[in-house]
């Protein structure tokens, strides 16, 4: 294990949207910044799970691809040259007698005056399809992530699920796939109302309320899927080239739970300054919680500057929490 002896003003744990915007804002406040990300790339779930998916609820963008948003956030942060550490997961956080912090990862030891946790939902894994042979076909043509939408051009695709991801992927596949069928075990979808309206007007075939009963295939992958009616005797077998499963994700904060932080429902409670119960440790984005919290990318973009400005005052009590508007800082 190596020791990174440089002392940073702010170390951001998590390189997703909130973390990247926080890195930019901290740079704008002339803080020495480090970002530690456990994944091989920046962007969090946007890059890892749906880089080709369009996002519609970010201010200023009628729509923007997830990876394009990550690229823009990265370029914005890089203006101030924060130190980026990839493929390191922070295991321990320890406060020292001099009020600074020591962060130990699986590879290095890092030193910082303040910490901002923007770890999203923490470590995540997809909920798997619980049908015989599903694990065998997973490396072939059963997909839990979509990294290249064009790979489904001209294909017969079945999407299984009823939430936002399932509906959004079905709509995005409709123009390029040969045919798209969306299967959900309930009559009603849990997706955004506007997306459901678009779905009903699309050519996507909707099969509800049905659930997966059997997979048919060979050594090359699934060739057909049999679905059974949830409260009936009807079955239907659909020929497929690819199956996309969107049952959501199971997430955990992992080692973060052992850092002495208050934890509430797999999130970190904060006050209006984004302060946790440990002075000098802040949280923003989906990992943070408070009364009325709404988990949106846009919400994290507001929380990040609040956390950074208060961290600035924490390490330098003579600093102002509100630095003025960016138009006067550049």
Swiss-Prot record:
It is an enzyme of class 1 (oxidoreductase). One of its GO terms (molecular function) is NADP binding. Signal peptide: none annotated. Binds 1 FAD per subunit. InterPro entries: FAD/NAD-bd_sf (IPR036188), FAD/NAD-binding_dom (IPR023753), Fd--NADP_Rdtase_type_2 (IPR022890), Ferredoxin-NADP_redctase_2 (IPR050097). It catalyses: 2 reduced [2Fe-2S]-[ferredoxin] + NADP(+) + H(+) = 2 oxidized [2Fe-2S]-[ferredoxin] + NADPH. Keywords: FAD, Flavoprotein, NADP, Oxidoreductase. The keyword Endoplasmic reticulum does not apply. Its cofactor is FAD. FAD binds at residues 37, 45, 50, 90, 124, 286, 327. It comes from the Bacteria. Its EC number is 1.18.1.2. Homodimer. Belongs to the ferredoxin--NADP reductase type 2 family. This is Ferredoxin--NADP reductase 2.
């Amino acid at each position: 294990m190596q020791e990174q002896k440089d002392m940073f003003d702010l170390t951001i744990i998590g390189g997703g949207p909130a973390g990247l915007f926080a890195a930019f804002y901290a740079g704008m406040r002339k803080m020495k910044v480090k970002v530690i990300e456990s994944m091989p790339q920046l962007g969090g779930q946007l890059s890892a799970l749906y880089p080709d998916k369009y996002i519609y609820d970010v201010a200023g963008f009628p729509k923007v691809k997830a990876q394009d948003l990550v690229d823009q956030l990265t370029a914005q942060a890089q203006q101030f040259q924060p130190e980026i550490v990839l493929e390191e997961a922070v295991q321990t956080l320890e406060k020292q007698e001099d009020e600074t912090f020591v962060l130990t990862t699986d590879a290095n030891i890092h030193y910082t005056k303040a910490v901002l946790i923007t770890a999203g939902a923490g470590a995540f894994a997809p909920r798997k399809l619980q049908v015989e042979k599903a694990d065998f076909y997973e490396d072939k043509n059963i997909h839990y992530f979509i990294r290249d939408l064009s790979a489904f051009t001209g294909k017969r695709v079945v999407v299984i699920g009823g939430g936002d991801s399932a509906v959004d992927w079905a709509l995005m596949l409709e123009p390029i796939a040969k045919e798209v069928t969306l299967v959900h075990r309930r009559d009603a979808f849990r997706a955004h109302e506007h997306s459901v309206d678009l779905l009903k007007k699309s050519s996507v075939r909707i099969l509800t309320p049905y659930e997966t009963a059997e997979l048919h295939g060979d050594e090359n992958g699934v060739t057909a899927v049999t679905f059974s009616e949830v409260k009936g005797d009807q079955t239907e077998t659909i020929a497929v080239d690819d199956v996309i499963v969107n049952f959501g994700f199971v997430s955990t904060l992992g080692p973060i739970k052992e850092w002495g932080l208050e934890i509430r429902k797999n999130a970190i409670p904060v006050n209006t300054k984004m302060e946790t119960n440990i002075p000098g440790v802040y949280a923003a984005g989906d990992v943070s919680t408070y009364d009325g919290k709404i988990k949106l990318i846009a919400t994290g973009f507001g929380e990040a500057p609040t956390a950074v400005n208060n961290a600035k005052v924490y390490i330098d009590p003579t600093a102002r929490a509100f630095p003025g508007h960016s138009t006067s800082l550049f």
